[in-house]
């Protein structure tokens, strides 16, 4: 049976892809059959007339997985916007059944799967007759989550709102990771302390350098549960 964890965040561009790549890379370095999946990606880049899932490409390159990144994303859109708007712009219906089927295939390929979300935890994936929110995907795939937050001023509010939303939706939170953490910044240091105290969760930090991430292999393995 495969194991998985879902990487969500307090918003866009706080480091979900970087953290996903870091986890997959560390597992791969230990000889573990680890892989990646993302249900919907917007902001795909056109290269030689073909759209490329850049987030997936980054993760696969960083973790040295020599595969086509597009094979690990169910829906890829060119418009850099929320998936629901990108799908509407390209007249595409996003189906939960495809996401589930694609994830089943990924599970058969890898022993450990890191699943990256889109935007923040309250992200509309598809608005239509059968609307899909990001939380619906997390529940459907039966995954625990890691919340990635920025370390800057204001992160206490955004992080705790994300924590409370997940709890209200009965989603299990494995940990919080503060990204772009500066161990010499008094605000960053206090943010970690306060978030840990308020959330009662384990709070890890990652700096701009991979070596500055304080997450051990044992901790990483504990993030993943049977799926």
UniProtKB/Swiss-Prot annotation:
Kindly list the places in or outside the cell where this protein is found, as annotated in its UniProt entry.
Answer: Cytoplasm
The UniProt record lists the keyword ATP-binding? yes
> EC number(s) of the enzyme?
6.3.3.3
**Entry binding sites for substrate:** 42
Reported cofactor(s): Mg(2+)
Q: What keywords is this UniProt entry annotated with?
A: ATP-binding, Biotin biosynthesis, Cytoplasm, Ligase, Magnesium, Metal-binding, Nucleotide-binding
Catalytic activity reads:
(7R,8S)-7,8-diammoniononanoate + CO2 + ATP = (4R,5S)-dethiobiotin + ADP + phosphate + 3 H(+)
| List of catalytic residues | 38
Gene Ontology MF term list: ATP binding; dethiobiotin synthase activity; magnesium ion binding
The record's listing under InterPro entries reads: DTB_synth_BioD, P-loop_NTPase
UniProt pathway annotation? Cofactor biosynthesis; biotin biosynthesis; biotin from 7,8-diaminononanoate: step 1/2
For whether the record's keyword set contains Nucleotide-binding, the answer is yes
Any one annotated GO CC term: cytosol
Instruction: Quote the record's binding site residues for ATP.
Output: 13-18, 55, 116-119, 179-180
For the ligand (Mg(2+)), the binding residues are 17, 55, 116
Q: Name one GO biological process term.
A: biotin biosynthetic process
Q: Which HAMAP family match?
A: BioD (MF_00336)
Summarizing the function annotation, the protein's role is:
Catalyzes a mechanistically unusual reaction, the ATP-dependent insertion of CO2 between the N7 and N8 nitrogen atoms of 7,8-diaminopelargonic acid (DAPA, also called 7,8-diammoniononanoate) to form a ureido ring.
Family, as annotated: Belongs to the dethiobiotin synthetase family.
Q: What is this protein called?
A: ATP-dependent dethiobiotin synthetase BioD
What gene is this protein a product of? Answer: bioD
């Amino acid at each position: 049976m495969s194991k998985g964890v879902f990487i969500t965040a307090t918003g866009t561009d706080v480091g979900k892809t970087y953290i996903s790549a870091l986890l997959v890379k560390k597992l791969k370095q230990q000889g573990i059959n680890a892989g990646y999946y993302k249900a919907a990606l917007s902001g795909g880049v056109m290269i030689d007339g073909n759209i490329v899932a850049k987030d997936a490409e980054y993760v696969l390159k960083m973790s040295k997985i020599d595969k086509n990144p597009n094979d690990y994303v169910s829906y890829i859109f060119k418009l850099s916007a929320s998936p629901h708007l990108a799908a509407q712009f390209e007249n595409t219906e996003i189906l939960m059944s495809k996401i589930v089927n694609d994830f089943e295939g990924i599970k058969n390929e890898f022993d450990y799967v890191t699943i990256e979300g889109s935007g923040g935890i309250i992200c509309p994936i598809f608005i239509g007759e059968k609307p899909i929110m990001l939380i619906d995907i997390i529940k459907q795939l039966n995954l625990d989550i890691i919340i990635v937050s920025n370390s800057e001023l204001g992160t206490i509010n955004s992080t705790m709102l994300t924590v409370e939303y997940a709890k209200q939706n009965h989603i299990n939170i494995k940990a919080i990771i503060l990204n772009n953490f500066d161990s010499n910044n008094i605000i960053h240091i206090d943010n970690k302390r306060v978030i840990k105290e308020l959330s009662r969760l384990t709070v890890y930090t990652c700096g701009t350098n991979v070596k500055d991430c304080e997450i051990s292999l044992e901790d990483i393995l504990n993030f993943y549960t049977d799926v």
